[in-house]
């Protein structure tokens, strides 16, 4: 996660080199006003706007005037205000500081998610129909099935919807329009534990603490570190292992 963020920032900085390599306008050409008439002006503006949006999104503070000056000086081939070694030191410090900042933000988010998840599960366990297991897994039987229960080596076919504790849906078989099929042991631990308790034909709502989901790592999208997850699972069928 940290490396991706640092790489993204470094890529943004590297794009200034791309500007110098691709733009053909003379370095002394005055900046356009509100009108962009040539392809070069449109390209230059697009690259600048894209960089600006990315810097803002990542919380990176820069001086647009100093950046424009550096771009102009680099393209002119004249004397630069900093030596190559000085610029290298500046960029290395920037990456180090950014990594530390992102790491602190990530750890803070992980602690917040963990606390919110624990509070949710603590309240949820007292709700009618909710069963709490020693592992921390919770479930509520919405529809009882009478089929076979799978083992960890069996293959199951399911329909499901996954959401965060705030109700945000992050995945669902409804998106693909078809059920999912996989081996019971090849999913997150909370799923593996719950599925082995479910008779085929059942529909359960399963509440999975972060340590039985993706833990402190972030898997991208809306699932952050230490997220408690909720799944509505309909176990359609079980294919017994040949082993």
UniProtKB/Swiss-Prot annotation:
Origin: domain of life: Bacteria
Range of residues in the leader sequence: 1-20
Reaction(s) catalysed (UniProt annotation): [protein]-peptidylproline (omega=180) = [protein]-peptidylproline (omega=0)
Activity regulation annotation text: Strongly inhibited by FK506 but is completely resistant to cyclosporin A.
Subcellular location, record wording: Cell outer membrane
Stored SUPFAM superfamilies: FKBP-like
Similarity comment: Belongs to the FKBP-type PPIase family.
Record PANTHER family: FKBP-TYPE PEPTIDYL-PROLYL CIS-TRANS ISOMERASE FKPA, FKBP-TYPE PEPTIDYL-PROLYL CIS-TRANS ISOMERASE FKPA-RELATED
Role, per record: Essential virulence factor associated with macrophage infectivity. Exhibits PPIase activity.
Protein name (record): Outer membrane protein MIP
Organism: Legionella micdadei (Tatlockia micdadei)
Lineage: Bacteria, Pseudomonadati, Pseudomonadota, Gammaproteobacteria, Legionellales
């Amino acid at each position: 996660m940290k490396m991706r963020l640092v790489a993204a920032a470094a890529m943004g900085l590297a794009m200034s080199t791309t500007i110098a390599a691709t733009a053909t306008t003379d370095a002394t050409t005055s900046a356009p006003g509100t009108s962009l008439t040539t392809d070069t002006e449109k390209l230059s503006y697009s690259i600048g706007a894209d960089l600006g949006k990315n810097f803002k999104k990542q919380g990176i503070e820069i001086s647009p005037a100093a950046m424009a000056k550096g771009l102009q000086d680099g393209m002119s081939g004249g004397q630069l205000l900093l030596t190559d070694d000085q610029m290298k030191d500046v960029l290395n410090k920037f990456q180090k500081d950014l990594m530390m900042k992102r790491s602190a933000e990530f750890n803070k988010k992980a602690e917040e998610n963990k606390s919110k998840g624990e509070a949710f599960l603590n309240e949820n366990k007292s709700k009618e129909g909710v069963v709490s297991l020693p592992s921390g897994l919770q479930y509520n039987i919405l529809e009882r099935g009478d089929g076979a229960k799978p083992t960890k080596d069996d293959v199951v076919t399911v329909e499901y919807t996954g959401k965060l504790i705030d109700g945000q849906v992050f995945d669902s078989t409804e998106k693909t329009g078809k059920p999912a099929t996989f081996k019971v042991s090849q999913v997150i631990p909370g799923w593996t534990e719950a599925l082995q308790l479910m008779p085929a034909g059942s529909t359960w709502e399963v509440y999975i603490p972060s340590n039985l989901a993706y833990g402190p790592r972030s898997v991208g999208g809306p699932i952050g570190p230490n997220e408690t997850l909720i799944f509505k699972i309909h176990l359609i069928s079980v294919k017994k292992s040949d082993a």
